[in-house]
Amino acid sequence: VYKRQNDAVAVDIGALKISDEYTFKHSVDVATMSMIVARKYGLDDKQVYEIGIAGLLHDIGKSKVPNEILNKAARLTDEEFAIMKQHSVYGYRILQSKEDLSMEIKLGVLQHHEKMNGKGYPMGITGDKIDLFARLISVSDIYDALVTERPYKKPFSPRDAVEMIMSMTEELDITVMRCFLESVILYPVGTDVALSNGETARIVENVPNAVLRPKVLGLTTGKVYDLANDVKCANVIIL
């Protein structure tokens, strides 16, 4: 079954790479992050494998969107955005007849722009009505889109992207968000940073429930700061 799934993915993702290099790279990034988050969520090996496939294929429907819209070097008009929003439906239709792909994969593709509060698309469904695969892919999709430079926008820093995601408590699955945040390492151990108190410090430990607030060692004072609890040094800038 895995070989047949791989063959189906290779054909579809190959077509996407030809039509749009950015979306191809984005899909690989989303697949990778989604698999990491799925593992943290507790999914088994088969489900993690399938979430990877769903991540690779989540934007396959963009191959049906006109290039002048897909690669427009400016923000889309309302009419153009309405066409762009159909890509998840196009993707589902492309995969619908592929019997070797599970329904979870297909629903992940169809629903990855749905929001927990019902303000997503294409169906505007809410909460647990959104397939788990779609809820998992959604967080990684948003993060990668935020940190990637596009002709019409500058990239967010990883820190700002994480803060944006943390603010989306009404749109995203909170449990999935928590798993994502516990999987993201913004400040690798050993990285030198500048603290808001003016001191230079080195990352010594990341805190799973406070990804923006690692523990650091002050290089001049030799003091360890727990930034989750020390508001005087809360801001961190990588040097």
Predicted regions located by residue number:
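Histidine- and acidic-residue-rich, metal-dependent catalytic cores
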Residues: K3-L239
